[in-house]
């Protein structure tokens, strides 16, 4: 990613908060397009006359875009200014969702989802760095949590609304709405996010070298295992809740909102814990998450326990993020 940014002491707390809100708006849009697709699988499957597992390729394509995009953009954009990069990333995201909305075939939709996923990791990485630099020492994890709060709020408001919109007006309308959010984010970043002063240039080799550091690798491993478990549950959550727990399909927007509330709670809690004791806090959260993921297999067979379990999955999964992001920034050094 681009060079480190110094703090901006001339900005008022209100200006800083407004900039972080603009960054969170992008996280909101990303959260909607990432998670709403899982609630729209049946509609997508019906539209193209395919099975739900086949429709699941639109989720896999997005995930592949995330995996491919993060390292490639790290190398290609190492000398870019952060505000410029953030706008370009959201431009790609917007384009991917607009193409998805008008996709005439499954293949086009899969390609569009791949494109929309490419900016995902880089956006959150750069946005977190900008937010942390604006917040200053002692408040960095909470600033990161505020950016990521957009992702959590998406699951409370955006995903249920997108699911409802997709059911009422077709899944295409949900992706088009996300495209509008992406375009609004580009404008918001241009207007309220400060252009950092030029600092020390970080070369791509230094950024890639950070991946070889044991602490960085350990942090990435914790994230891979934790989020892998979370998404293993969430990817087919509609099938689990409807066919296993016995919840009526019409209640899915409300169920997804419960998951989103868990993410909001976890995001706030995770930021507070990370600022107090980063490593011990992450260990505690990861341990609790492991237990909850294991118990969900049993909880999923009853409507009440399935919903409670989903809330806790969202809480613990989201609580990991601020601490992991802050830890990566701490140990990556110049490679951040």
Feature map (PLM): residue ranges:
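Cytoplasmic helix-loop-helix junction between adjacent transmembrane helices
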Residues: 112-150
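Helix-breaking motifs and short loop linkers at transmembrane-helix boundaries and internal kinks
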Residues: 49, 81, 102-108, 246, ...
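C-terminal transmembrane helical hairpin of 12-TM major facilitator-type secondary transporters
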Residues: 280-324
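Helix-to-loop junctions at the C-terminal end of transmembrane segments
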Residues: 70-81, 266-278
């Amino acid at each position: 990613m681009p060079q480190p940014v110094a703090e901006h002491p001339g900005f008022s707390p209100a200006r800083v908060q407004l900039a972080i809100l603009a960054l969170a708006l992008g996280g909101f849009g990303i959260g909607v397009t990432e998670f709403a697709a899982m609630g729209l699988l049946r509609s997508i499957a019906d539209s193209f006359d395919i099975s739900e597992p086949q429709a699941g390729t639109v989720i896999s394509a997005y995930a592949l875009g995330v995996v491919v995009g993060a390292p490639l953009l790290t190398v290609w954009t190492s000398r870019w200014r952060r505000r410029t990069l953030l706008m370009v990333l959201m431009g790609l995201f917007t384009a991917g969702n607009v193409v998805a909305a008008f996709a005439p075939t499954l293949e086009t939709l899969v390609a569009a989802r791949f494109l929309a996923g490419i900016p995902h990791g880089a956006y959150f990485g750069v946005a977190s760095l900008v937010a942390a630099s604006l917040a200053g020492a002692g408040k960095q994890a909470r600033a990161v949590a505020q950016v990521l709060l957009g992702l959590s709020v998406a699951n409370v408001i955006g995903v249920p609304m997108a699911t409802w919109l997709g059911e009422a007006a077709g899944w295409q309308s949900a992706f088009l709405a996300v495209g509008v959010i992406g375009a609004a984010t580009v404008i918001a970043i241009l207007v309220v996010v400060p252009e950092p002063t030029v600092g020390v240039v970080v070369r791509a080799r230094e950024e890639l070298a950070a991946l070889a550091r044991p602490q960085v690798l350990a942090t990435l491993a914790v994230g891979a295992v934790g989020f892998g478990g979370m998404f293993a549950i969430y990817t087919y959550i509609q099938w689990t809740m409807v066919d296993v727990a016995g919840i009526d399909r019409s209640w899915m927007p409300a169920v997804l909102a419960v998951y989103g509330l868990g993410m909001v709670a976890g995001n706030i809690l995770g930021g507070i814990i990370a600022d107090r004791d980063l490593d011990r806090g992450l260990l505690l959260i990861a341990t609790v998450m492991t237990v909850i993921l294991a118990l969900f297999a049993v909880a999923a067979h009853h409507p009440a326990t399935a919903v409670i379990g989903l809330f806790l999955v969202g809480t613990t999964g989201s609580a990991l993020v601020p601490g992991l992001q802050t830890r990566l920034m701490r140990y990556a050094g110049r490679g951040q």
